[in-house]
Amino acid sequence: MKYGLQMYSVRDLTEHDLRGALQQVAEMGYSFVEFAGFMGNSAEDVKSWLEEYSLQVSSTHTPLAELEDEVLDQTIAYHKAIGCKDIIIPYAKLETKEQIDAFVERVNTLIPKLQAEGISLHYHNHDCDFAPTPEGLVPEEELLARTSILLEVDTYWTFVAKQNPVEFIRQHKDRIHMIHLKDGMGDHTGKSLGQGVAPVK
């Protein structure tokens, strides 16, 4: 298993100085990073900084807006330039059957396009993805049943949704290549591992 840092965790640094943030992450001993935006920096600059600090990209959190047809080629080119083979959709509003249907359709269109470029598509869950819609659909279950998208399981949000993260990972291990391991206070208040409500050991 490889460990890395999600750059969103140090967003106060990345927003002002992505290069400096990468340097500090490397000095902390990390070898892998997951980007949550590039703050307007070019792929060439990001690649050079990764090489300078001996870092590798595990993946990126890329909003669905950056995967629309009009910008998809640009997004793919950027990821290939920095050596990233995994794109993760960090969030989608899936509160109704209509929203789920539209998302499923888009995901099923994106997957083969990305696969043709050597890139895998993942979805990062929040607690709301386990909440039934008014029509009785559970978003996470619908994605598993109706698409081949991979999952990046957020253990904290899975726990907040009153699911057992360990059992969920075991049940869907073939669809899970990445895990977000974190802690918090049962809401959006983050805590260091072991300092929140999640049973992290």
Name each model-derived stretch.
Residues 1-85:
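N-terminal pre-domain/capping segments
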Residues 4, 34, 59-61, 88, ...:
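Conserved beta-strand positions in the central sheet of alpha/beta enzyme cores
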Residues 11-16, 32-45, 63-71, 94-101, ...:
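Acidic-and-aromatic substrate-binding clefts and catalytic sites of carbohydrate-active enzymes
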Residues 19-20, 70-75, 100-108, 135-141, ...:
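Charged helix-capping and loop-helix junction motifs
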Residues 46-63, 110-114, 140-147, 201:
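Alpha-helix-loop-beta-strand connector modules within alpha/beta enzyme cores
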Residues 79-98, 117-127:
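Active-site groove signature of glycoside hydrolases
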Residues 116-197:
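Acidic/histidine-rich catalytic cores of soluble enzymes
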